[in-house]
From Swiss-Prot:
It comes from Lactobacillus helveticus (strain DPC 4571). Keywords: Cytoplasm, Glycolysis, Lyase, Magnesium, Metal-binding, Secreted. GO terms for biological process: glycolytic process. Mg(2+) binds at D242, E286, D313. The keyword Lyase applies. Pathway: Carbohydrate degradation; glycolysis; pyruvate from D-glyceraldehyde 3-phosphate: step 4/5. Pfam families: Enolase_C (PF00113), Enolase_N (PF03952). (2R)-2-phosphoglycerate binds at Q163, K338, R367, S368, K389. This is Enolase.
Length: 428
């Protein structure tokens, strides 16, 4: 039996959850098997992220992706035709070489990633395997999920500077049971916010976007909601934050402008300590310092790495070279993994492997501009015992991922998943 090869690569312009254009790619093999992928996009982006190719001009506010689509349908299609879909690394490297830039800016990371993801899906389909099995092998575990239920920063139009307030199930249990707890807290939170006199409109990621005065008020609302839903903060449900500190860091004075205060590195650490003391269920912080504030991040890691999970997002941008540098410097103890920050499946998996090898936890992440694509749900299972954040249990583009995880758990027949506990954080 002849091995199937790539016969055609085709892209089209579709729209994401914020009504912005994005790229959908179909990779068709010589035996008729097809793999499809849809590319997400972010509202808050790190300086070192791979570059999305946008059209500019007046059409669709300059955000059209017809150039990226055309690059897939011409150059990339011609280059990949006849290649082995199972050789993911070779396919991805072919596109990187074809692009010829350090940030995938000529062809567009949105074009390259769409093809990379769709190729993996096509190979899995051709091999009659679910994607998580194709990417991950045999011994698999369900991920621990983090749910953004109060939105601030770049994700909402309110007075909260910290970007995300998340809840996570931490009792060792099935994914379904943990997710049901999250849903209960989410609906309880809506009532708590209404009782506090706040609007309960939703942000980009399905979380509420109340016009609160500060982060402490948001954490109090979460703490109260966990208890009112019948759970114990820090035992059943934990809290995590994406500080996204680059967005309240002022480059001119080198200070953090947070909730009416102007803070240096040490004062910002004191601010975080106050939150950690008041809310011991707060167990994970993402990007607590600016992506270029190496001293601040390293000092905070040294003093807090055994107390909380410190997740690097903008600091590493899912880039193996930047992660290697962060590890050498002693920054963080967990890596956030976003496919479109680096632009290929191969480089994403390399970053995950490097993280694990060096004792860093790994958290797979969605973007604020999402689609119904569930690739990241399968990826989170494939990496075995990782973490996943993909928004609140609301808005279909978020819930699609959680429903996919429910399907996977059913297929695996797993009654229990690996859970993250704060006591596990020790990377000395």
């Amino acid at each position: 039996m002849l091995k199937s090869v790539i016969e055609n690569v085709h892209a089209l312009e579709i729209f994401d959850s914020r009504g912005n254009p994005t790229v959908e790619v179909h990779v068709t093999l010589s035996n008729g098997v097809v793999g499809k992928a849809e590319v997400p996009s972010g509202a808050s982006t790190g300086e070192n992220e791979a570059v999305e190719l946008r059209d500019g001009g007046s059409r669709l506010g300059g955000k059209g992706v017809s150039k990226a689509v055309n690059n897939v349908n011409t150059e990339i299609n011609d280059a990949l035709k006849g290649m082995d879909p199972y050789d993911q690394a070779k396919i991805d490297q072919t596109m990187i070489d074809l692009d010829g830039t350090p940030n995938k800016g000529r062809l567009g990371a949105n074009a390259i990633l769409g093809v990379s993801m769709a190729t993996a899906v096509a190979a899995a389909n051709d091999n009659h395997q679910p994607l998580y099995r194709y990417l991950g092998g045999i011994d698999l575990e369900m991920p621990q999920t983090f749910h953004n239920v109060i939105n601030g920063g770049e994700h909402a139009d309110n007075g909260i500077d910290i970007q995300e307030f998340m809840i996570t199930p931490i009792a060792k249990t099935s994914f379904r049971d943990g997710f049901e707890k999250i849903v209960n807290v989410y609906h309880t939170l809506k009532k708590v916010l209404e009782d506090m006199g706040y609007e309960t409109g939703l942000g980009d990621e399905g979380g509420f976007a109340p016009n609160m005065k500060n982060s402490e008020e948001a954490l109090k609302a979460l703490h109260e909601s966990i208890i009112k839903a019948g759970y114990k903060p820090g035992e059943d449900i934990g809290i995590a934050c994406d500080c996204a500190a680059s967005y309240f860091y002022n480059k001119e004075d080198g200070k953090y402008h947070l909730e009416g205060k102007v803070l240096n590195d040490e004062e910002l650490a004191d601010y975080y300590d106050k939150l950690l003391d008041e809310f011991p269920e707060l167990m994970s912080m993402e990007d607590p310092y600016d992506e270029n504030d190496v001293d601040g991040m390293v000092k905070f890691t040294k003093s807090h790495k055994d107390r909380i999970q410190i997740v690097l997002d903008d600091f590493i941008c899912t880039n193996p070279a930047l992660l290697k540098k962060a590890i050498k410097e002693g920054a963080g103890n967990a890596s956030l993994i976003k496919l479109n920050q680096i632009g290929t499946v191969t480089e994403t998996l390399e970053t995950i492997r490097m993280s694990r090898k060096n004792g860093y936890n790994t958290m797979i992440s969605h973007r604020s501009g999402e689609t119904g694509d569930t690739f990241i749900a399968d990826l989170a299972v494939a990496i075995n015992g990782g973490q996943l954040k993909t928004g609140a249990p609301a808005r279909s583009e978020r819930v699609e991922k959680y429903n996919r995880l429910l399907e996977i758990e059913e297929e695996l027949g797993k009654g229990e998943r690996l859970a993250f506990f704060p006591d596990d954080i020790d990377h000395d």
